[in-house]
Regions:
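Terminal-region recognition feature
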Residues: 1-174
C-alpha cells in the first residue's frame, strides 16, 4: 500500500509545492508564501519570483515591455579561464540563463495599473545570473524608463534584487 502511494507522487513534486526556510528550517507551502509576499514567519525573505511579484502588484493584468533586440550582452567576448571550468565563454552562461528563465535579460519590465494609477515596474530576476546588470539590462532599463516618460505614468517602481554590475562586461556594465 505504501509503495502505491509513493509511485503515484510525481517525482520532484515536493520541490514545486514546498519551500524550506534556511533561517528557521520551517517548510512552507508556496501558495501560502505568495500571500505573505514570500516572507517566512521568521522574517526571512525568499526570492520572490518576478512574474508572481508583478501578478501581486498590478490590479489585473499587465503588458511586458520587451527587451531591445541586437544588444550584445558580452561586448568583451569574455572567456573564463579557471581551474574548474577551463576556457568557457561567458556568452554560454548567458544563453543558459536565457534558457532557464525564458528571458532575454535579467529584467522583467511591465506596464499596467496599480490601484487605478498607471505604472511601470522593473523587476530583476535573481535566477538570471544573480540579477546581473550588464549592457543588455542597461538598455532594457532605459527602454522601460523611456516608455514611462512617454506615457507619463503615475508610478515608476524598480525592484532591485540583483547581485550588482556584471564585471564580465567591463565599463559597458555601468
Amino acid at each position: 500500500r505504501v509503495k502505491q502511494i509513493f509511485k503515484k507522487q510525481p517525482i520532484g513534486q515536493e520541490e514545486t509545492d514546498w519551500k524550506n526556510c534556511p533561517q528557521c528550517k520551517k517548510i512552507s507551502y508556496k501558495p501560502d508564501l505568495f500571500y505573505s509576499s514570500y516572507i517566512c514567519e521568521c522574517s526571512y525573505h525568499f526570492d520572490f519570483p518576478p512574474k508572481l511579484r508583478l501578478d501581486s502588484l498590478f490590479d489585473s493584468g499587465y503588458e511586458i515591455i520587451e527587451a531591445p533586440k541586437n544588444i550584445n550582452p558580452d561586448p568583451l567576448n569574455f572567456e573564463v579561464k579557471d581551474g574548474a571550468q577551463e576556457g568557457y565563454k561567458y556568452m554560454d552562461k548567458i544563453k543558459k540563463y536565457r534558457k532557464v528563465t525564458g528571458q532575454e535579460t535579467a529584467l522583467i519590465c511591465a506596464s499596467g495599473n496599480i490601484s487605478n494609477l498607471s505604472a511601470v515596474v522593473v523587476c530583476f530576476n535573481p535566477k538570471f545570473g544573480g540579477g546581473r546588470f550588464g549592457p543588455a539590462e542597461n538598455e532594457h532599463f532605459l527602454k522601460a524608463a523611456s516608455f514611462a516618460i512617454e506615457k507619463k505614468v503615475d508610478i515608476w517602481i524598480v525592484i532591485y534584487q540583483s547581485s550588482g554590475i556584471d564585471v564580465h562586461s567591463g565599463i559597458t556594465g555601468l
